[in-house]
Every structure is written in C-alpha cells, then in structure tokens.
Amino acid sequence: LRDIEVTYPNQAWAIDITYIPMAKGFLYLVAIIDWFSRKVLSWRLSNTMDTSFCLEALEEALKHYGPPDIFNSDQGSQFTSAEFTQALLDHGIRISMDGKGRWVDNVFIERLWRSLKYEEVYLKAYTTPREAELEIGNYMVFYNEERNHQGLNDLTPDETYFGRQRYAA
C-alpha cells in the first residue's frame, strides 16, 4: 500500500494478529480494518494461531461489507497460506503484503492494537476467554461508533465509513 492513495471505504482492508494477555495465559486476536475509515470490520479470538480463525474473520467482513479492492497483511503464515490467499483471489481481491519486519506498512491496525491494549486490555485481567470476548467486543463497538480519531478530522470510524457526520443538537 506504500504508493497507493486510499480515498474511499473498501478500497483497502488490513488484517493483523496480536496477543491478548489474560490473568493466566493469553489469546490471539485477529482483526480486519478498513484502511480509509479505520473501521473494525470483523475480529475473532482464538487460543491457537491457525488460519481458520483468520478465515472466519475474513468471511464475516466479506458477508457484511462486500470485497475490498486490496487486502493488506504482513507475511504471517496464516495470511500466506494457500487457503487464505485463495479465499481472497476467489473474490477478485488484490493481495498486498508488507515488507518483512515493516510494521509501519500496516500502521492503522498497529494503532488499533495500541488503543485497544492501553484503553481496555491492560486495565483488566480477563479470567476466561468468554470475558475477554465480551469486553473486547464492547471496546470494538466503542472504537467504531464513539471514539473520535484525530486523523479522521475528529470523526469516528463509522462516521467516516458510512459518510455521516454528527451535528450538534
């Protein structure tokens, strides 16, 4: 995505995986965001870092939002697997992969991880996967619907994605 100007929703999506610490152990979280609006389109938690939970997140995003033009990821084995890349190609999606070790190529999803962890995850000690799923789900709704982004002219991801603005009452 380095030389592409992203100017509309669903032009480019990004995916990444992060660790979610628990009171005992950790879970893996995958999320797909719209590059233009920063909207979290789908996400999944798993206790294993396999391709299936990434495919579930992809299928959910495609079902609700249709295919993007471009899909960006790092070179993780889940995203380079034949099953995952074929799912993208089957929908006519152009695949873009970051350079090795270039987290800056996926800066918006890295920013999501930072916000999620400092505003939610690190403030809690989830005791069960179900608790983590509920609390992270609540945060994702907040992130999309209520959290203003300076880079979006202080609009929320939903306002930017759907082209709406709030008006003072």
Language model features with spans:
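Charged DNA-binding/catalytic regions of mobile-element recombinases
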Residues: 1-169
